[in-house]
């Protein structure tokens, strides 16, 4: 098998939420190569309390050598599917605008996120799962 990518999903159940880690792996020669982790996205799916039915996404990362190939979008699609499977109705994300360029907001908007709130220096965006 030639070069490719695949994802693995790990779910840890807690009392009030499920923590999810989705890892992205890359291989050059599937039969003779040890895959390397080149991306990750993490999310928490809340089962009870104020945020019940919401999934919060954080820590989306793709290694620089593997960017511009649609892999971050692939990880986010996997995160949305997993959140929906675990009962989330909404997926949210937030970050500091001081630490991220504005194009990040535009990218998430293209993924279907709407800007729900802006705090001083912070952004919160949501989309249905």
Task: Describe the predicted segments one by one.
Residues 1-58, 82, 118-119:
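Acetyl-CoA-dependent GNAT
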Residues 44, 125-129:
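Short beta-strand-to-coil "C-cap" segments at the C-terminal boundary of structured domains/repeats
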Residues 46-48, 65, 98:
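Short coil/turn motifs at secondary-structure junctions
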Residues 58, 63, 96-98:
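Residue-level recognition of the GNAT/N-acetyltransferase active site
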Residues 62, 68-81, 110:
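Conserved acetyl-CoA-binding loop-helix of GNAT-fold acetyltransferases
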Residues 88-90:
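Short, high-confidence coil segments that cap the C-terminus of an alpha-helix
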Residues 92-105, 121-123:
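Conserved beta-strand-loop-alpha-helix junction that forms the acyl-donor binding cleft
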Residues 108-119:
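Conserved acetyl-CoA-binding loop of GNAT-fold acetyltransferases
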